[in-house]
Amino acid sequence: MRAIRMLLVSALTLGSVTAYAGEQDVQRLTQLLEKSQTIEANFSQLTLGADGTSLQETSGKMTVKRPGLFYWHTDAPQEQVVVSDGKNVTLWDPDLEQATIKKLDVRLNQTPALLLSGDVSKISQSFDIASKEQGEVMDFTLKPKTKDTLFDSLRVSFRKGLINDMQLIDSVGQRTNILFNGVKANQAVPDSKFKFDIPKGADVIKE
């Protein structure tokens, strides 16, 4: 009986420690994300199949601004521009001369870019969060709490308090790694940066 009681006490104690650690992880991640009201950076993106085969490699520049504004420009030869004005997202494909416009999904588990530019005050409602610190690098692993999501796992890494890289893993094991460099935080960025003017004569698709 005493052994059972000891196990119960241990389990309760461990449960309390885990919950506390989880709350700390949420607070640390929220503080790091909210610390940067604007971010400008270059990025390189690599997508790997479940077997490790390279599927796509791109690079470009991005700018984000809270709340909900972002601009991602992927360079040629696979050039595309994705812009959010906080209400709608416009995807511009210059090769097709086509713009696709859809309403911004403000759910963090549907639009990962909003981790860097959206409202993260309730991030724990969408994800279970764990952290790991190694020197000047802080890693956070986010697991969606629902199945209605674009990815199974998301890792966000910070170096010296600034975003360093992100990794998304989807349901079939495909991994997308995004490395940021030349990161500048809290610079003055006008809202006009997030207004995309569709070229005349382009095809426009509204979803």
UniProtKB/Swiss-Prot annotation:
The keyword Protein transport applies. Pfam families: LolA. One of its GO terms (biological process) is lipoprotein localization to outer membrane. Residues 1-21 form the signal peptide. It is found in: Periplasm. One of its GO terms (cellular component) is outer membrane-bounded periplasmic space. Keywords: Chaperone, Periplasm, Protein transport, Signal, Transport. Belongs to the LolA family. HAMAP family: LolA (MF_00240). NCBIfam families: lolA. Monomer. Participates in the translocation of lipoproteins from the inner membrane to the outer membrane. Only forms a complex with a lipoprotein if the residue after the N-terminal Cys is not an aspartate (The Asp acts as a targeting signal to indicate that the lipoprotein should stay in the inner membrane). This is Outer-membrane lipoprotein carrier protein.
